[in-house]
């Protein structure tokens, strides 16, 4: 049985000190949602076979509740809850007794049965301004002496126009002045909760992608896809939200003009890695955080999904913060310590945070930016272009990771550009 502790990846900061080290993301029995499961079906099943399978599940579950599991209660009595269809991947969540789980694991249509997992948010603390990260995007990784150093940010004025960034997170304050009306509410998977951001993380991430002051792609649209609320979630909600995003991108004909950001990480969980991989095969790019364990990211989800763009965090002087995960699965390094962006609590609120949650949206913003300035026909082309622009061999203590930092390619362009101060 695989266990997961899954978190959004921002870390607290104390003025005058380096960012404190995060608590390791540890998995344990308390992470499992008792009686609740994610069932992955084998590929190639027809709609009729899936329909018949669900009828079989309902019949077996009902019989088990009346017989073997007569004492079952709570979520175990729910049966099938939600179905997820991502490209050709079919999964469903449900509440089942142990006997039904045993029956499911032996069913010829079932690939795997995993316990659903709790998903936890990381602690955050408000801190003063830091704007070095944007300047880093256009400076070819030029280090600065202090995180408070202001650096010019040069960029093509298309700046993500016409592109959609989907933020699977805690929601977004779409009325924040930084978004200038370019943020919209998409999907809210959390029952009986408003589609607002009470935690701040999603608004912060969206601001790095597309805020008018703090954003990489200052004209991109951002879509709030809420799978977290105030501290925890489960794959039941995360998969529902990711499924909605993939469907919305596909139905809106936005595959070459959309990017998904996942500033989340936890122990390896194959069903969600599979979902990210299927989205890639469907023609959709996903950018993910490497994680804040200070360990090899190959053991984290969704960082370990083979065709996600996995992002580690770098400091202003080109060192790897000790919290950032590393390893061969990390594709690129981006600013991730003392980064200022939008926040909860008001339409002008800001916060300065650290973590690979901040690094990932820098690259998601770059993807949106490049989609608006270049004709990138597929997620493979997106990844190739992002990596082709990187500057090599700058990160100190990158361990065995590919050593390449993010760059937007602006210095090679031959026309007058606006500047951000």
Curated annotation (Swiss-Prot):
Residues 17-122 form a propeptide. This is Subtilisin-like protease 2. Residues 131-421 form the Peptidase S8 domain. Belongs to the peptidase S8 family. The active site is at 169 (charge relay system), 201 (charge relay system), 357 (charge relay system). Its EC number is 3.4.21.-. It comes from Trichophyton equinum. Gene3D superfamilies: Peptidase S8 propeptide/proteinase inhibitor I9, Peptidase S8/S53 domain. InterPro entries: PCSK9_ProteinaseK-like, Peptidase_S8/S53_dom, Peptidase_S8/S53_dom_sf, Peptidase_S8_Asp-AS, Peptidase_S8_His-AS, Peptidase_S8_Ser-AS, Peptidase_S8_subtilisin-like, Peptidase_S8_subtilisin-rel. Residues 1-16 form the signal peptide. Keywords: Glycoprotein, Hydrolase, Protease, Secreted, Serine protease, Signal, Virulence, Zymogen. It is found in: Secreted. One of its GO terms (molecular function) is serine-type endopeptidase activity. One of its GO terms (biological process) is proteolysis. It comes from the Eukaryota. The gene is SUB2. One of its GO terms (cellular component) is extracellular region. Its main location: secreted. Residues 36-122 form the Inhibitor I9 domain. Secreted subtilisin-like serine protease with keratinolytic activity that contributes to pathogenicity. Pfam families: Inhibitor_I9, Peptidase_S8. PANTHER family: ALKALINE PROTEASE 1-RELATED, PEPTIDASE S8. Glycans are attached at residues 248, 261, 348, 388.
């Amino acid at each position: 049985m695989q266990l997961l502790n899954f978190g959004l990846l921002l870390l607290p900061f104390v003025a005058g000190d380096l960012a404190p080290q995060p608590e390791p993301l540890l998995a344990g029995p308390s992470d499992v949602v008792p009686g609740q499961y994610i069932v992955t079906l084998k590929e190639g099943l027809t709609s009729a076979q899936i329909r018949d399978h669900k009828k079989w599940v309902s019949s077996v579950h009902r019989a088990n509740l009346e017989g073997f599991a007569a004492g079952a209660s709570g979520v175990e009595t729910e049966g099938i809850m939600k179905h997820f269809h991502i490209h050709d991947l079919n999964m469903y969540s449900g509440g089942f007794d142990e006997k039904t789980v045993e029956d499911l694991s032996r069913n010829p249509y079932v690939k795997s049965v995993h316990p659903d997992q709790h998903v936890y948010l990381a602690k955050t603390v408000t801190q003063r301004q830091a704007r070095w990260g944007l300047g880093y995007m256009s400076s070819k990784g030029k280090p600065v002496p202090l995180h408070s150093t202001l650096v010019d940010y040069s960029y093509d004025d298309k700046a993500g126009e016409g592109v959609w960034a989907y933020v699977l997170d805690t929601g977004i304050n779409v009325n924040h002045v930084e978004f200038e009306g370019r943020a919209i509410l998409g999907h809210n998977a959390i029952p009986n909760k408003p589609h607002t951001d009470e935690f701040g993380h999603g608004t912060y991430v969206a601001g790095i992608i597309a805020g008018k002051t703090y954003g990489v792609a200052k004209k991109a649209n951002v879509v709030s896809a809420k799978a977290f609320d105030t501290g925890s979630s489960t794959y039941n909600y995360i998969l529902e939200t990711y499924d909605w995003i993939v469907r919305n991108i596909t139905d809106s004909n936005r595959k070459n003009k959309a990017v998904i950001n996942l500033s989340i990480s936890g122990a390896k969980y194959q069903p969600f890695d599979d979902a990210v991989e299927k989205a890639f095969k469907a023609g959709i790019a996903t950018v993910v955080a490497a994680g804040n364990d200070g360990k090899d990211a190959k053991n984290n989800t969704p960082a370990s999904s083979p065709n996600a763009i996995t992002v580690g965090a770098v400091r202003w002087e080109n060192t790897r913060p000790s919290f950032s995960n590393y390893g061969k699965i990390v594709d690129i390094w981006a600013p991730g310590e003392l980064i200022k962006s939008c926040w909860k609590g008001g339409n002008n609120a800001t916060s300065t945070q650290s973590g690979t949650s901040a690094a990932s949206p820098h690259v998601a913003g770059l993807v949106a930016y490049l989609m608006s300035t270049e004709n990138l026909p597929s997620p493979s082309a997106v990844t190739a272009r992002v990596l082709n622009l990187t500057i090599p061999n700058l990160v100190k203590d990158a361990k065995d990771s590919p050593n390449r930092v993010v760059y937007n390619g602006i210095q090679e362009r031959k026309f007058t550009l606006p500047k951000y101060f």
